[in-house]
Curated annotation (Swiss-Prot):
<keyword id="KW-0963">Cytoplasm</keyword>
<comment type="subunit">
    <text>UreD, UreF and UreG form a complex that acts as a GTP-hydrolysis-dependent molecular chaperone, activating the urease apoprotein by helping to assemble the nickel containing metallocenter of UreC. The UreE protein probably delivers the nickel.</text>
</comment>
<dbReference type="GO" id="GO:0005737">
    <property type="term" value="C:cytoplasm"/>
</dbReference>
<keyword id="KW-0143">Chaperone</keyword>
<dbReference type="GO" id="GO:0016151">
    <property type="term" value="F:nickel cation binding"/>
</dbReference>
<keyword id="KW-0996">Nickel insertion</keyword>
<dbReference type="InterPro" id="IPR002669">
    <property type="entry name" value="UreD"/>
</dbReference>
<protein>
    <recommendedName>
        <fullName>Urease accessory protein UreD 2</fullName>
    </recommendedName>
</protein>
<comment type="similarity">
    <text>Belongs to the UreD family.</text>
</comment>
<dbReference type="Pfam" id="PF01774">
    <property type="entry name" value="UreD"/>
</dbReference>
<comment type="function">
    <text>Required for maturation of urease via the functional incorporation of the urease nickel metallocenter.</text>
</comment>
Length: 311
């Protein structure tokens, strides 16, 4: 199977030079190891619908659901991984497009597990496009890189000036309750995000790169005492961003903090960034939901329902 062009470009990333050996079980990018997903949402007869759906295992979306009681017009699409996690040699592409005036929520059925590896790596390329007046919440669950894993994710965001995108990356530093060497025991975690306007004007570029043995993760201002973190981008018009920032209260308890969080402005008046760290995933998730609720209220005048019991 021919690789999606951006996936082919990922192979040349500097941090992947030491992980080019082919897996013994099945070569990298072989049929069955290239997952593809394309979702297109549009406004039809006053209702946002999933009008375009293409999927190739192990990525799967069945249909749009309308189960958000606080925002019943919102189509919700959970991404299902039928493979039970990401393996060495896997290559994923995800393309999400929200048309003019439409809205959508895309999430995952559970954590994104990056399994142990002894050869090669896994990679993912995402393209997210939100047209004029559109609204998208793309909030995948936590990524959990197992000991010895290598994962690179590249995300391109294309957002119109009057649209709103809430995009999140949340990470747990390994199976912390499984083995003492699991915490930051992965070989490589590389995640970069590039944001631009439909005309091509570049607004924001950010990259998180954690390689095995990196001493900076233990710094007091980084991850000392914490095992989970989240970076949540809110790309929205400046006036909406100002209202959100005014309402969100940073969380910096002095004694025995379970979580820390704060919001900063993105360059080029592109919106806001929430950064949160926590002891457990639910500590970070709580901070993300605080921010998410305010974003939805200010951007769409809708509330956020109570978190499901299964969470």
């Amino acid at each position: 199977m021919t690789l999606h062009e951006p996936l082919g470009l990922i192979d040349a990333a500097r941090e992947l030079r030491g992980f080019q050996a082919e897996p013994a079980q099945m070569r990298a990018g072989a049929p069955g190891k290239v997952g593809r997903l394309r979702l297109g949402f549009s406004l039809r007869d006053g209702r946002s619908v999933l009008h375009d759906l293409y999927r190739a295992a192990p990525l799967l979306v069945q249909q749009a659901l309308y189960w958000d009681e606080a925002m019943p017009e919102l189509p919700v699409c959970p991404i299902i991984s039928v493979g039970g996690g990401i393996l060495q040699g896997d290559r994923y592409t995800i393309d999400i497009a929200v048309g003019e005036g439409a809205c959508a929520h895309v999430s995952t059925q559970g954590a994104n597990r990056i399994h142990c590896m002894d050869a090669n790596y896994a990679s993912q390329h995402q393209t997210v496009t939100v047209a004029a007046g559109g609204y998208l919440e793309y909030l995948p669950d936590f990524t959990i890189p197992y000991r010895g894993s290598r994962f690179l994710s590249r995300t391109d965001l294309v957002v119109a000036a009057d649209a709103t995108l809430l995009y999140g990356e949340m990470v747990l530093a390994g199976r912390k309750h499984h083995h003492v060497e699991e915490r930051f025991g992965f070989d490589l975690l590389s995640m970069d995000v590039n944001l631009r306007r439909p005309g091509g004007h570049k607004l924001v570029a950010e990259k998180i790169l954690i390689e095995k043995g990196d001493p900076t993760i233990a710094f007091a201002a980084v991850m000392r005492g914490f095992d989970a973190f989240a970076n949540i981008l809110c790309v929205t018009p400046p006036e909406t961003a100002a209202r959100i920032k005014e309402r969100f209260e940073p969380h910096f308890p002095i004694e025995a903090p379970r979580a820390l969080s704060g919001v900063s402005r993105l360059p080029n008046a592109a919106g806001l960034m929430l950064r949160a760290v926590g002891v457990e995933t639910y500590d970070v998730r709580h901070e993300v939901r605080r921010f998410w609720r305010i974003v939805r209220e200010e951007a769409r005048d809708r509330s956020l329902p109570a978190e499901p019991y299964w969470r």
